[in-house]
Regions:
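Short amphipathic alpha-helical interaction segments
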Residues: 42-58
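Minor-groove-contacting beta-hairpin "wing" of winged helix-turn-helix DNA-binding domains
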Residues: 68-76
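Short alpha-helical segments that sit at the start of domains
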Residues: 1-24
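Short acidic, hydrophobic short linear motifs in intrinsically disordered regions
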Residues: 27-41
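Alpha-helix N-cap/helix-initiation sites
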Residues: 10-11, 27-31, 46, 67
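Short, amphipathic alpha-helical interaction segments positioned at domain boundaries
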Residues: 78-89
Length: 89
């Protein structure tokens, strides 16, 4: 059986993903590849990024931009900018 993700680690990964997208200005015109999102997360938590990213998409904070020739790309939902800025601060 696999390791479970604690609530604190879940929030850390969530904040890290949103911060990275926000700092790279990945809004309506920009996007960020999956590999770039996972690069700042510790190796023992890297397996949980997909789970957290799926939850962010369900919440509507992150949008799946599409597949590029380099991999999956993601961007922030501009309509939920206030919620995103609350999470970051």
């Amino acid at each position: 059986m696999g390791k479970k993700l604690s609530n604190l680690d879940y929030l850390r990964i969530k904040k890290n993903i949103i911060k990275r997208l926000y700092s790279n200005k990945a809004f309506s015109k920009g996007h960020l590849l999956y590999e770039r999102l996972t690069s700042g997360i510790p190796p023992h938590l890297a397996g949980f990024v997909n789970h957290v990213l799926d939850d962010l998409i369900k919440e509507g904070l992150v949008i799946h931009y599409g597949r590029t020739k380099y991999g999956d790309a993601y961007q922030l939902n501009v309509q939920k900018l206030k919620e995103i800025e609350e999470i970051i601060s």
